[in-house]
Structures are given as structure tokens and as C-alpha cells.
């Protein structure tokens, strides 16, 4: 079975996220655990935590199919010592919030060197940031999201992601979330079944499919290898429906959250139905 959903709003309280996911027919979902535009947020109350857990259980969402995302402000590879410390503290707080909610994974953008340090130094810093977060928490898995390679953001190649993972001490608490738009922007073709199969084979050889903990399903506005992060609705961009059908049918996409971050929330339910139809067609 494929667990397909979207990154839903937490407006009115984080406990509303599973209800919004249910409204669009999702079997998985992503969310922020706080306002992602702010460094600090009030601690989660016992009442909020209980309501969130109850709504997840009532709506049938298991922890492994929920993928919280950390704040975009965080840069775990920052070359600035003060900003790095602030980012690390914020990330630890988000890992702790993830655990408090009873969830098991936290999606993060690896980091950026801001053209002030070498790529290798930045990747080393990111790995050490993850290690420090592990030391300060108990169970949450840090899930590295591949990037589009825009600007000085790292994590756009499988080699860079593997470099980080190799330096994380607790391998059981690190993984990868593959964003299809980012993959395409970074030069990984996804337009055909052959291309998709090749991408997963390369990922397995470079990193290992057992590290794949989730995917973001987004079509891409720009052409292949554009290094531009511009999401498009499923089937409306340069990847196209054949690519997404191949992803849904590939064994690697089973049992992990498959999350839409496409630009039209009003058609998420339609996109979920479309993606699910690819799996149903395979089972016929």
C-alpha cells in the first residue's frame, strides 16, 4: 500500500493537522510542529499533545506515516558560529517536539555554506549537528531532504547525502526524504519508468534504500538540471505523469509517507486520487 498525503496547515492548533489530512483523503501527512518563520515557540502543552495523538489515532495515522518538517530558518551547516549554535538549538527543540508528539521522524534541509566555507567543511558541520541533536534526544530520526542545488545549499547529490550519513554516529536515527522536484532540478531524470528505476538503483548503490524514509511528490516547473526549486502540480510540469506512475509502482515507495507540496492545496484531494490510481492500475 502507498501512504499518500500532503503538507497540511496547523492553523488553529497542531491537533488540527490530522483532521485536515483526513478531509483530503490522505493516508499520510506532513506538518510543521510550530510557526516555521519563528526561531522560538511556546512549549507544546499536555492538552495539545493529547489532542494531536487522539486525532491521529482516530483518523488512522501511524507515526511512521507522519513526517514533520523543521523550520526553514535552521542552517545546520552555517559557517557563522553564533548562527550555527542558534540553528542547532532550534533543531534540538524540533526533535524534542517530534518526540513529544509521539512521532518518529523529522524532515530537515541539510544546510548551506553561504559561500563562506568549503562544501566538505559544511557537510562535516551538518553531520556534527545531527550527532549533537541525537545526543540531546532519545528516538527521533533526522531525515535529510535532498535539495535542488540552488545557491549554496548542499544535499543535492546522493554523494553529499552519503557523506553526511557516513559521519552520523547512530545510523539507526538518520534517513533521507527524496523530493522529486529537487531531484529533477539537480539533474536526476524522472520522466520515464527507465529513468525512475535508474534513480532508485543509483540511490541504493550510493546510500542504501533502507535509508529512504519518505518522499515529497512535486512536479517541476523548470527543465532538467535547472538547479531551481519551483514546484508544479502533478502532471503539469516537466516530470509528467509517466514519471509519477513509475514512482508509485516502484517497491521503494511502499510503506513510506509520500507527501505533496504542490502549489494548489485546493486540488490536493484530486492529486491524491490520481496518484492512488497508479497503484490501483498496477494491482489490476
From Swiss-Prot:
Belongs to the AP endonuclease 2 family. Keywords: DNA damage, DNA repair, Endonuclease, Hydrolase, Metal-binding, Nuclease, Zinc. This is Probable endonuclease 4. It holds the Pfam family AP_endonuc_2. Zn(2+) 1 binds at residues 69, 109, 145. It catalyses: Endonucleolytic cleavage to 5'-phosphooligonucleotide end-products. GO terms for molecular function: deoxyribonuclease IV (phage-T4-induced) activity; DNA binding; DNA-(apurinic or apyrimidinic site) endonuclease activity; phosphoric diester hydrolase activity; zinc ion binding. The gene is nfo. Its cofactor is Zn(2+). It is an enzyme of class 3 (hydrolase). Zn(2+) 2 binds at residues 145, 179, 216, 261. InterPro entries: AP_endonuc_2, AP_endonuc_F2_Zn_BS, Xyl_isomerase-like_sf, Xyl_isomerase-like_TIM-brl. Binds 3 Zn(2+) ions. Zn(2+) 3 binds at residues 182, 229, 231. CDD domains: AP2Ec. Endonuclease IV plays a role in DNA repair. It cleaves phosphodiester bonds at apurinic or apyrimidinic (AP) sites, generating a 3'-hydroxyl group and a 5'-terminal sugar phosphate. GO terms for biological process: base-excision repair. Its EC number is 3.1.21.2. NCBIfam families: nfo, PRK01060.1-4.
Amino acid at each position: 500500500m502507498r501512504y499518500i498525503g500532503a503538507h497540511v496547515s496547523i492553523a488553529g492548533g497542531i491537533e488540527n493537522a490530522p483532521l485536515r489530512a483526513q478531509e483530503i483523503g490522505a493516508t499520510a501527512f506532513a506538518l510543521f510542529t510550530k510557526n516555521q518563520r519563528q526561531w522560538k515557540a511556546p512549549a507544546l502543552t499536555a492538552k495539545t499533545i493529547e489532542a494531536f495523538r487522539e486525532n491521529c489515532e482516530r483518523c488512522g495515522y501511524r507515526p511512521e506515516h507522519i513526517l514533520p518538517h523543521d523550520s526553514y530558518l535552521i542552517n545546520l551547516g552555517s559557517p557563522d558560529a553564533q548562527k550555527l549554535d542558534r540553528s542547532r538549538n532550534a533543531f534540538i527543540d524540533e526533535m524534542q517536539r517530534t518526540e513529544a508528539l509521539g512521532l518518529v521522524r523529522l524532515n530537515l534541509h541539510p544546510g548551506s555554506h553561504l559561500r563562506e566555507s568549503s562544501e566538505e567543511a559544511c557537510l562535516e558541520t551538518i553531520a556534527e549537528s545531527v550527532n549533537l541533536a541525537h545526543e540531546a534526544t532519545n528516538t527521533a530520526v533526522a531525515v535529510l531532504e535532498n535539495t535542488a542545488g540552488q545557491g549554496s545549499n548542499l544535499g543535492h547529490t546522493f554523494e553529499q547525502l552519503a557523506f553526511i550519513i557516513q559521519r552520523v554516529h547512530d545510523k539507526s536515527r538518520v534517513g533521507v526524504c527524496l523530493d522529486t522536484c529537487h531531484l529533477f532540478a539537480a539533474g536526476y531524470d524522472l520522466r520515464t519508468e527507465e529513468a525512475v528505476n535508474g534513480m532508485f538503483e543509483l540511490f541504493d548503490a550510493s546510500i542504501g534504500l533502507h535509508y529512504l524514509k519518505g518522499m515529497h511528490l512535486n512536479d517541476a516547473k523548470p527543465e532538467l538540471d535547472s538547479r531551481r526549486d519551483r514546484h508544479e502540480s502533478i502532471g503539469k510540469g516537466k516530470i509528467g505523469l509517466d514519471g509519477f506512475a513509475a514512482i508509485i509502482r516502484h517497491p521503494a515507495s511502499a510503506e513510506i509517507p509520500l507527501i505533496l507540496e504542490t502549489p494548489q492545496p485546493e486540488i490536493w484531494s484530486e492529486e491524491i486520487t490520481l496518484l492512488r490510481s497508479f497503484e490501483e492500475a498496477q494491482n489490476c
